[in-house]
């Protein structure tokens, strides 16, 4: 008699994806972030569901309903802070996951990589709309400034912005639709993540050496289920420590003031995980140019498979590319810092140099480094 997990139609799918899946024997902890992103999504959907039970998407009562959740709902404060900081954890895991993909050449699985970029866009859209919901000062002005960027699109821009707003300014209609989209998008993300995994399992995982691992595979369970579980325990411990001891560290104090259309905050800025893109947007003095640079700062990831010139897949044995990769990481830290600073010297020029360097490394220097390394290694 066949084992149930190998014969039952539903169990068979789970078995092929998480139990009998052949996995490379040498994948490191950098491969843990995929499962951690799944964990983040589950945490966000669960905590978000409980918040939605008590939240009111109305301009008059939205801010009060969040205060009510924190004060009057049993463990409401905990659910709210788990959800708010869960977004930060989500983006930390997301950026590390993308960084791993770039370093080890995982982007050569084109379908998986492109679905991943779609997931990044969906997650960014979800996070942006979620930030608007508490209806604090930074929520309101962040929504106004970011949606207003679409008015830079020639001819249809203004109509498009008013269509998104549902009126002539960010108001009740905007808040209601943002809540609706913020609720539905995580489920779309979950479905897209399934497609991401489907494409990944067509090819199998990459590994740190960037060489085919068909000759040395091990079953996913128990080896990687246990390894992923260890990652989950460690990350949850760090996450809960952060939530319980420093819940407001990453938030903006302005968001503790109710939204006021008549009073603009001195420095409008998004959450920390968007600051690098915000810095690139601000580094170009032209509105349309800035919007194009903003979109390209993420879309440029799609060019990685096309710009891969090296004969080796991974950067593990490519010192020049390694140096450029870590320069790119440092550059992103600088852009994140600049995104949170006011638009004044010397921050303007630092932001512009960092933005030029960001695109130069990806579009020019890494492909050249690949060719040089081919020559050095006589490939």
UniProtKB/Swiss-Prot annotation:
Co-factor requirement: heme b
Binding site for heme b b562: 83, 182
Region forming the signal peptide: none
One Pfam family recorded for the sequence: Cytochrom_B_C
Transmembrane region(s): 33-53, 77-98, 113-133, 178-198, 226-246, 288-308, 320-340, 347-367
Molecular function via GO: metal ion binding; ubiquinol-cytochrome-c reductase activity
Protein residues bound to heme b b566: 97, 196
InterPro entries for this protein: Cyt_b/b6_C, Cyt_b/b6_C_sf, Cyt_b/b6_N, Cytb/b6-like_sf, Cytochrome_b, Cytochrome_b_C_euk/bac, Cytochrome_b_N_euk/bac, Di-haem_cyt_TM
Entry annotated with the keyword Isomerase: no
Chain residues that bind a ubiquinone: 201
Keywords: Electron transport, Heme, Iron, Membrane, Metal-binding, Mitochondrion, Mitochondrion inner membrane, Respiratory chain, Transmembrane, Transmembrane helix, Transport, Ubiquinone
Membrane-related topology note: Multi-pass membrane protein
Biological process, per Gene Ontology: mitochondrial electron transport, ubiquinol to cytochrome c
Cellular localisation: Mitochondrion inner membrane
Cellular compartments per GO CC: mitochondrial inner membrane; respiratory chain complex III
Annotated cofactor note: Binds 2 heme b groups non-covalently.
Job of this protein: Component of the ubiquinol-cytochrome c reductase complex (complex III or cytochrome b-c1 complex) that is part of the mitochondrial respiratory chain. The b-c1 complex mediates electron transfer from ubiquinol to cytochrome c. Contributes to the generation of a proton gradient across the mitochondrial membrane that is then used for ATP synthesis.
Self-association state and partner proteins as the record states: The cytochrome bc1 complex contains 11 subunits: 3 respiratory subunits (MT-CYB, CYC1 and UQCRFS1), 2 core proteins (UQCRC1 and UQCRC2) and 6 low-molecular weight proteins (UQCRH/QCR6, UQCRB/QCR7, UQCRQ/QCR8, UQCR10/QCR9, UQCR11/QCR10 and a cleavage product of UQCRFS1). This cytochrome bc1 complex then forms a dimer.
Family: Belongs to the cytochrome b family.
Other comments on record: Heme 1 (or BL or b562) is low-potential and absorbs at about 562 nm, and heme 2 (or BH or b566) is high-potential and absorbs at about 566 nm.
Name assigned to this protein: Cytochrome b
Source organism of the structure: Chaetodipus eremicus (Chihuahuan pocket mouse)
């Amino acid at each position: 008699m066949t084992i149930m997990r190998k014969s039952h139609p539903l169990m068979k799918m789970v078995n092929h994806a998480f139990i009998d899946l052949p996995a490379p024997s040498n994948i490191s902890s950098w491969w843990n972030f995929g499962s951690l992103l799944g964990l983040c999504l589950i945490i966000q959907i669960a905590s978000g569901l409980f918040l939605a039970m008590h939240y009111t998407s109305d301009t008059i009562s939205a801010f009060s309903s969040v205060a009510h959740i924190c004060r009057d709902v049993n463990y409401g404060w905990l659910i709210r802070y788990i959800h708010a900081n869960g977004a930060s954890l989500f983006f930390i895991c997301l950026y590390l996951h993308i960084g791993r993909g770039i370093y080890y050449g995982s982007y050569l699985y084109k379908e998986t990589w492109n679905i991943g970029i779609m997931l990044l866009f969906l997650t960014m859209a979800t996070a942006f709309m979620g930030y608007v919901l508490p209806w604090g000062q930074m929520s309101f002005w962040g929504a106004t400034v970011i949606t207003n960027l679409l008015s830079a699109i020639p001819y249809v821009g203004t109509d498009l912005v008013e269509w998104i707003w549902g009126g002539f300014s960010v108001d009740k209609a905007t808040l209601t639709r943002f809540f609706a989209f913020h609720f539905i998008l995580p489920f779309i993300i979950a479905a897209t993540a399934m497609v991401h995994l489907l494409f990944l399992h067509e090819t199998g995982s990459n590994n740190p050496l960037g060489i085919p691992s068909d000759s040395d595979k091990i079953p996913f369970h128990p080896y990687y289920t246990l390894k992923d579980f260890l990652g989950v325990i460690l990350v949850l411990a760090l996450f809960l420590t952060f939530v319980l001891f420093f819940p407001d560290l990453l938030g903006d104090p302005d968001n503790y003031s109710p939204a006021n259309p008549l009073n603009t905050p001195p420095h409008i800025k998004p959450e920390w995980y968007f600051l690098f893109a915000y810095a690139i947007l601000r580094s170009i003095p032209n509105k349309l140019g800035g919007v194009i640079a903003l979109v390209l700062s993420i879309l440029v990831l799609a060019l990685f498979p096309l710009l891969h010139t090296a004969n080796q897949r991974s950067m593990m044995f490519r010192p020049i590319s390694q140096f450029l990769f870590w320069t790119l990481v440092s550059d992103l830290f600088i852009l994140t810092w600049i995104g949170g600073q006011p638009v004044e010297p010397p921050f303007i020029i630092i932001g512009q140099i960092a933005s030029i360097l960001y695109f130069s490394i990806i579009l020019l220097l890494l492909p050249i480094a690949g060719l040089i390394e081919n020559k050095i290694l006589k490939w």
